[in-house]
Amino acid sequence: MSLLDAHIPQLIASHTAFAAKAGLMRHTIGQAEQQAMSAQAFHQGESAAAFQGAHARFVAAAAKVNTLLDIAQANLGEAAGTYVAADAAAASSYTGF
């Protein structure tokens, strides 16, 4: 029996909630990308060049955000596993009350 078991469900719930929110953010970024591609046809001349530059920066930023979301999600998942493993390994050193 571990003295630290109370936080394991919270870690798992946080990982699940973060995965859902990250999925929603990815979907929103994807929708913004589609809307931008649709709007691109309305730009001409200098406006088109400016739009393409801004769109390229958006795509680069979106890629960075998606990478950070992947890293954060992996870290949350790993935290729960590491916590459980470390807690189980230390369980033998716990003394009774």
Swiss-Prot record:
InterPro entries: ESAT-6-like_sf, T7SS_ESAT-6-like. The keyword Secreted applies. One of its GO terms (cellular component) is protein-containing complex. The gene is esxS. In the heterotetrameric form, EsxS adopts a long helical conformation that pairs with a second EsxS monomer in an antiparallel manner that allows the N- and C-termini of two EsxS subunits to interact with an EsxR subunit at each end of the EsxS dimer thus creating a molecule with four-helix bundles at its extremities. Keywords: Secreted. This is ESAT-6-like protein EsxS. Forms a tight complex with EsxR. Exists in heterodimeric and heterotetrameric forms. It comes from the Bacteria. Belongs to the WXG100 family. CFP-10 subfamily. It comes from Mycobacterium tuberculosis (strain ATCC 25618 / H37Rv). The keyword Secreted applies. It is found in: Secreted.
